[in-house]
C-alpha cells in the first residue's frame, strides 16, 4: 500500500477537522461518555481552534493519504508549542491517528518515520509524547519504535481526567 504524506497549511483546516474528528471518535468513543467526547471535540477540533494551531510556526501537521483518500494525520510540536515543558530541542508528537480501516498497513509507521525525519532535520535530542494508559495499541506501537516511559500527566477529555503515560525516544545526540 502506497502512503503519501502532505504538509497542511491554514487552508487545510476543514480537511484536518474531518480526519481529526473521524479518527478520535473511532479511537475513543467506546471508552468514554458521549458528553465528554462531544465537549472535547467541540473544544479541540473546531475549525477556529485548528486554524490557530495550523498557523502556529512551532506546530506542524501532515496527512497520510492512500489512493487520494486522507486516512490519518500527524501533529508535531517544537519549542513553546509543546504541551509540557521539555528541552527546547525536543520534538513532541502530539497526535498520530489513523483510520481503523488502515491499521496494520504501514500508515502509522509512515507517519512516525516522517516524525523521525523531522526530528533528525531539526537535530532534536529526543522525541516525546503522551499516550492514554488504556490505549494498548498505541503503547505497543511506541514501545516497538523504541519509546520508553518517563512519567505521566493528566489529560482532560471533556470533564474526565485521564492518565497519559509520557514516553520518549532518545536520539543519542
What function would you assign to each model-found segment?
Residues 2-4:
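Extreme N-terminal starter segment of soluble prokaryotic enzymes
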Residues 68, 72, 106-108, 146:
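Conserved phosphate-binding and hydrolysis motifs of nucleotide-dependent enzymes
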Residues 7-13, 17-30, 38-101, 112-114, ...:
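Acetyl-CoA-dependent GNAT
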Residues 104-117, 140-144:
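Conserved acetyl-CoA-binding loop-helix of GNAT-fold acetyltransferases
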Amino acid at each position: 500500500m502506497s502512503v503519501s504524506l502532505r504538509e497542511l497549511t491554514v487552508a487545510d483546516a476543514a480537511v484536518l477537522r474531518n480526519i481529526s474528528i473521524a479518527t478520535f471518535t473511532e479511537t475513543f468513543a467506546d471508552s468514554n461518555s458521549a458528553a465528554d467526547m462531544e465537549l472535547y471535540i467541540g473544544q479541540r477540533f473546531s475549525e477556529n481552534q485548528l486554524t490557530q494551531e495550523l498557523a502556529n510556526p512551532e506546530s506542524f501537521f501532515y496527512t497520510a493519504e492512500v489512493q487520494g483518500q486522507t486516512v490519518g494525520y500527524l501533529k508535531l510540536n517544537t519549542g513553546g508549542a509543546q504541551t509540557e515543558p521539555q528541552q527546547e530541542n525536543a520534538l513532541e508528537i502530539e497526535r498520530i491517528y489513523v483510520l481503523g480501516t488502515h491499521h496494520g498497513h504501514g500508515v502509522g509507521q509512515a507517519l512516525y518515520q516522517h516524525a523521525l525525519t523531522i526530528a533528525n532535520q531539526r537535530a532534536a535530542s529526543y522525541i516525546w509524547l503522551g499516550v492514554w494508559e488504556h490505549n494498548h495499541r498505541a503503547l505497543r506501537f511506541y514501545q516497538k519504535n523504541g519509546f520508553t516511559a518517563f512519567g505521566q500527566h493528566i489529560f482532560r477529555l471533556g470533564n474526565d481526567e485521564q492518565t497519559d503515560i509520557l514516553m520518549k525516544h532518545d536520539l543519542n545526540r
